[in-house]
């Protein structure tokens, strides 16, 4: 299964956090083609810089290492994603989540997320 990981889903999965649903854990561990948006990597870096997230090493090397370790690919932000972002209604104000929603819609891929705010958009949510 190909899917985009929400930032918290990625962080919870690599930490073995029990807040992940069994279904989301199975997708993370199974033979899936998972993507992490560069928007999520940017969000992680910002959270570390603001002191809202502690990681065992600098965010960039840590995330890149975890991506390689778990066979997760990155999803770049392209012009089509930006145009889809612009068209989104303002149900949700978090710009990182809105970019993930735009990418999900534009790429026609489900999002792995526990965030109920994603349900206000026509994205397929896995949890």
Task: List each language-model region with its residue ranges.
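Alpha-helical structural signal
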Residues: 24, 41-42, 96-97, 101
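Generic structural signal for small/hydrophobic residues in well-ordered secondary structure
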Residues: 7-8, 44, 85, 104
């Amino acid at each position: 299964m190909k899917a985009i990981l929400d930032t918290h889903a990625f962080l919870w999965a690599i930490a073995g956090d029990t807040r992940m649903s069994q279904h989301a854990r199975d997708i993370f561990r199974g033979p899936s083609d998972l993507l992490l948006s560069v928007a999520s990597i940017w969000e992680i870096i910002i959270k570390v810089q603001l002191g809202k997230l502690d990681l065992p090493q600098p965010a960039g090397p840590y995330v890149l290492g975890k991506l390689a370790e778990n066979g997760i690919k990155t999803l770049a932000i392209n012009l089509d994603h930006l145009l889809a972002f612009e068209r989104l209604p303002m149900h949700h104000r978090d710009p990182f989540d809105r970019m993930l929603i735009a990418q999900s819609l534009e790429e026609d891929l489900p999002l792995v997320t526990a965030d109920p705010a994603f349900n206000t958009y026509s994205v397929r949510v896995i949890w």
